[in-house]
């Protein structure tokens, strides 16, 4: 009997202790979850991070382009190294972006000094104080009576004269910039217009407004009590974060849209209205990479008659346009099928026909599986395509006043 009672008491104590331990573990788990929920992982990555102060010139980075147009370290001769500091991905990314801004300015210099292009400010009637964008044009872009070539890049950080920043930094200037296209076009008698579809806004530092208060309806608490509560919470957060990081405060920025150029589509339309369409050239040719293809289709939807009357051919490279989503009319789809060719990323040899995704623009292989390389890899084929398109148009114009649908059909066997 005594043994049973003792066993019962022991069991009761054991269960109670287990419950207490479980409760203690549960409380610890809850506390840990609460702790983790308040830790900003991005902030933790800033721990012991070096200052985000980077050089403003290529010389400062100790890099330069060699005779082959490759970016190399001036002391070691090595290519660019992204992981300059191990386990500091955010810092390395910021360093890469800082170098990218320098590259953008470098390409602008090459466009002006080597390609003899001049900058045209947008909007054309911009006031001194409003945000502005720009494009680059050759001296004869508006006066060339024969033909002009228009270059439109994809979306993202790339600016006028660039196809892909990654290629410029890691490969060479030929593959990553539009300079080879510009030089070849000028050699063949084209005027040139280089668009800048991603320069859509002016970035300025955001100025905080201390007078800006929360809406009176946001809370039933008295304003004074709410402010004291927020102050206490903010102090707690600050004290908490200080344990985990060496803070680097980044400036908070805001973007002021550029009038009538607030998106790639707007920019392309504006450039057409104020520059491309005002050119004296009878024949217009367009190279559009990635999102640039979508911007061109949008242009055609808005200026169909004008485009059809003057654009002889469009070379797209891995274009992301979609005639269904963009609601392009059947007449536009028919025109694209006759006057456009899309060089897409593919393992097939260059210029090999690729199954069409939609019944609008013929697709051929760019001879590479890398999206950003499609423009460079199809360089020779694009100029041949334009030459054939112009010859077909001139033959049709001289032989008959009536142009048949088949006369402009892309002859892939000619590539």
UniProtKB/Swiss-Prot annotation:
Residues 1-18 form the signal peptide. GO terms for cellular component: cytoplasm; nucleus. InterPro entries: Arb2 (IPR048263), Arb2_dom (IPR053858). Residues 204-215, 222-242 have a biased composition (Basic and acidic residues). The active site is at 290 (nucleophile). GO terms for biological process: mRNA processing; regulatory ncRNA-mediated heterochromatin formation; RNA splicing. It comes from the Eukaryota. It is found in: Nucleus; Cytoplasm. Keywords: Cytoplasm, mRNA processing, mRNA splicing, Nucleus, Signal. Residues 204-242, 392-415 are annotated as: Disordered. Pfam families: Arb2 (PF22749). Residues 406-415 have a biased composition (Basic residues). May play role in the regulation of alternative splicing. May have hydrolase activity. PANTHER family: COTRANSCRIPTIONAL REGULATOR FAM172A HOMOLOG, FAM172 FAMILY PROTEIN HOMOLOG CG10038. Belongs to the ARB2A family. This is Cotranscriptional regulator ARB2A homolog. It comes from Danio rerio.
């Amino acid at each position: 009997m005594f043994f049973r009672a003792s066993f019962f008491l022991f069991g009761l104590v054991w269960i109670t202790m287990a419950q207490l331990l479980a409760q203690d573990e549960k409380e610890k788990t809850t506390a840990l979850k609460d702790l983790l929920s308040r830790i900003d992982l991005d902030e933790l990555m800033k721990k012991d991070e070096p200052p985000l102060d980077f050089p403003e010139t290529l010389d400062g980075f100790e890099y330069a382009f060699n005779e082959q147009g490759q970016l190399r370290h001036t002391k070691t001769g090595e290519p660019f190294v992204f992981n300059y500091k191990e386990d500091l991905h955010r810092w390395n990314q910021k360093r890469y972006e800082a170098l990218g801004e320098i590259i953008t300015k470098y390409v602008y210099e090459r466009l002006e000094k080597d390609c003899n292009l001049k900058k045209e400010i947008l909007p054309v009637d911009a006031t001194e104080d409003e945000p502005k964008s720009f494009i680059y044009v050759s001296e004869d872009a508006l006066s060339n009576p024969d033909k002009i070539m228009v270059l439109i890049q994809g979306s993202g950080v790339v600016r006028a004269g660039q196809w892909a920043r990654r290629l410029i930094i890691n490969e060479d200037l030929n593959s990553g910039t539009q300079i080879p296209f510009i030089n070849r076009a000028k050699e063949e008698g084209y005027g040139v217009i280089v668009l800048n579809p991603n320069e859509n806004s002016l970035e300025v530092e955001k100025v905080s407004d201390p007078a800006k208060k929360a809406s009176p309806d946001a809370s039933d608490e008295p304003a004074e009590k709410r402010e004291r509560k927020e102050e206490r919470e903010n102090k707690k957060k600050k004290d908490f974060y200080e344990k985990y990081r060496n803070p680097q405060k980044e400036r908070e920025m805001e973007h002021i849209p550029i009038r009538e150029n607030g998106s790639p589509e707007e920019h392309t339309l504006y450039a057409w209205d104020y520059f491309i369409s005002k050119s004296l050239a009878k024949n217009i040719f367009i190279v559009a990479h990635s999102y640039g293809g979508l911007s061109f289709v949008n242009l055609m939807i808005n200026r169909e008659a004008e485009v059809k009357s003057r654009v002889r051919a469009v070379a797209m490279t891995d274009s992301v346009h979609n005639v269904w989503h963009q609601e392009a009319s059947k007449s536009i789809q028919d025109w694209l099928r006759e006057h456009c060719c899309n060089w897409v990323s593919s393992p097939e040899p260059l210029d090999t026909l690729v199954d069409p995704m939609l019944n609008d623009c013929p697709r051929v292989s760019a001879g590479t599986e890398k999206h950003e390389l499609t423009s460079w890899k199809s360089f020779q084929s694009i100029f041949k395509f334009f030459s054939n398109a112009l010859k077909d148009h001139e033959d049709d114009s001289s032989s008959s006043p009536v142009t048949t649908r088949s006369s402009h059909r892309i002859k892939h066997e000619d590539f």
